[in-house]
């Protein structure tokens, strides 16, 4: 049994690649379970808007999935 984990920040590219793999597996006649989507990890970053730190402390929020 072989397990393959594939990740990408671009969902469309990931779906196309997984589709190609499933087509190859179906042509060869091998039994396949999946694809099973893994939970989405989120990276959240807060940065100050002003670089010098004086005045009001206002933050920008960035998120990467």
Swiss-Prot record:
GO biological process: translation
Pfam families from the UniProt entry: Ribosomal_S10
SUPFAM superfamilies: Ribosomal protein S10
GO molecular function: RNA binding; structural constituent of ribosome
Function text: Involved in the binding of tRNA to the ribosomes.
Subunit text: Part of the 30S ribosomal subunit.
Protein's UniProt name: Small ribosomal subunit protein uS10
Species whose genome carries this gene: Desulfurococcus mucosus (Desulfurococcus mobilis)
């Amino acid at each position: 049994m072989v397990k393959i984990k594939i990740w990408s920040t671009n969902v469309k590219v990931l779906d196309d690649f997984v589709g190609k793999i499933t087509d190859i597996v179906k042509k060869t006649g091998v039994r396949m379970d999946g694809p099973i989507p893994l939970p989405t990890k989120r990276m959240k970053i807060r940065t100050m808007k002003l670089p010098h730190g004086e005045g009001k402390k206002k933050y920008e929020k960035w998120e990467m999935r």
